[in-house]
Amino acid sequence: MKKLEDLKTKIDFTKIISKNKTFRVKFVKQGDVSLSSQEVEPYLGEVIFNQFKGKIKASMDNPDYIVYVYLFNSNCYIGIDYSGFDLSKRDYRVFANPRSYHANINYILLKIAELKETDTLLDLFCLSGETGIEAALYLTKRSPNYFGKKNFAFNKFFKFNFDKVDKEIKKTKSKIVLSSPTMGDVKCAQKNAKIASVEKSIDFTRQDIEWIDFKFKKKESVD
């Protein structure tokens, strides 16, 4: 996409957005892009309005649907925002250590490591506990947004059976150990894990590295 007229999309929004609902357009860009949100948002808004032949309203403050336009160089992506907030954020990070990796980075690393049930996970420098907490959430099938279900944007336009998903939450057979030579880090990790409701799935210990072997049985391996 190089010019504004290219936004005359073939997408039929009448099949995506329900009648008698409100909407707004948000524009995000990266790379070599000359277009601005002041140009793109009203333009696509008018395209959508015309598709509905005026039988839809725009709302800048509290729309039912947010139509996202993401432009990266000449590539344009258009979609509906189902979350309504940044999914990389974690509400449990109340006692955060500035040296910790962001929680979503920890989750990605756990996926790359192919963490699975019955594995043992040890974090020697747990800081504020994100690695172990993300592992516990993943293995117990508990959503990081378990307590924020009502905040999802899709609640405005369709009903989702959260109870069915919550029934999949289980105990994990894995051993997750969060350790640190500093008691302050251990306490922060414990508090964050409690906020995330996974503190019972994690062992917390203040240990110097040279003594950590005593935390595990002789035949027990650490993954």
Q: What residue ranges belong to the model's regions?
A:
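SAM-dependent Rossmann-like transferase core, predominantly class I methyltransferases
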Residues: I78-I112
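Short conserved loop adjoining the S-adenosyl-L-methionine
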Residues: W211-K218
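Short SAM/SAH-binding signature in class I
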Residues: E220-D223
